Amino acid sequence: MFNIVKHFWLLITIKKYIKKYKLKVKVRNYFNSIRLTTNTNSLNFITLTEKSNYEKKVKEIRRSNVNAQIILLIPNVDYRKIFNEHLELLGVIDVKNSLANIASEISDYLDYFFNIE
């Protein structure tokens, strides 16, 4: 289960990354997601528990911003369901991995989003 502690750990990890590279980004923290907004695009981290309906959240984000990038952080990733629903995600992170692996994956996605090499 992706609990509140891990959600705030994710928020702190993202803010450290932004501070490290001195990026101009707005960070919005919602109950089950974190949104990073630049002048041209947005990146959404969806952090839901096993019983939540993440398809609904992804489609809600897509309705408001077709070009938004979305990363899903969930346990027990069902790639077939994600593929069949045509969710168009930038990435999926299995939160059952260690925090070090999750942090590495988050950093990789942020590098890609902000074009940092």
Language model features by range: what are they?
Residues 14-22, 61-62, 106-110:
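Hydrophobic, Leu/Ile/Phe/Ala-enriched alpha-helical segments that form helix-helix packing faces
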Residues 27-43:
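Acidic, metal-coordinating helix/loop segments flanking the phosphotransfer/catalytic sites
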Residues 11, 39-70, 76-80:
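Conserved phosphotransfer microenvironments
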Residues 75-79, 83-117:
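Output/docking surface of receiver
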